[in-house]
């Protein structure tokens, strides 16, 4: 199976709004519209909030509830909710000496598709991304690197397209 990786950056300005149904006093939703970029036609929706003064939390990705502090290096992917899938991901990260700082899993129904979000201490090597993307149990794998420059957030995405 041929797996290709495309790197691109999304520059965005953030705005804050409180939604009645979010369950949080203050929350922010960022929608990354990827339509037209590399023939992709999708929107990724990430919601978050702040606890206390400065404890940021990602609370939802694409409709899946999560609890995850954002980090500089992250992996987002959908996986089938079945035994052994996450073990295979963790083993491949460990073999590449990539440490997991935080991990959150959200699912809507038992045995259906779930969303995994992982904060890492370093970027994932391309060969590990290729191995993970080649798994039939993993879909929509995206490696994310987030950098902030003078109130502008630069998000570098590496979606595995196959």
Name the predicted role of every residue range.
Residues 1-149, 162:
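A conserved regulatory-domain signal marking ACT and ACT-like small-molecule sensing domains
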């Amino acid at each position: 199976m041929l797996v290709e990786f495309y790197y691109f950056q999304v520059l965005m300005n953030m705005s804050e709004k409180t939604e009645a149904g979010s369950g949080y006093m203050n929350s922010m939703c960022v929608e990354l519209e990827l339509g037209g970029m590399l023939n992709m036609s999708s929107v990724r929706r990430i919601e978050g909030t702040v606890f206390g003064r400065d404890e940021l939390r990602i609370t939802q990705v694409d409709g899946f509830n999560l609890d995850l502090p954002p980090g500089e290096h992250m992996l987002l992917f959908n996986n089938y909710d079945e035994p052994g899938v996450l073990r295979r991901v963790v083993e491949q990260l460990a073999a590449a000496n990539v440490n997991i700082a935080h991990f959150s899993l959200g699912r809507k129904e038992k045995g259906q598709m779930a969303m995994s979000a992982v904060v890492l201490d370093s970027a994932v090597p391309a060969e590990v991304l290729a191995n993970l993307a080649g798994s039939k149990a993993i879909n929509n794998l995206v490696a994310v690197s987030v950098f902030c420059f003078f109130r502008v957030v630069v998000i570098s995405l590496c979606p595995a397209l196959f």
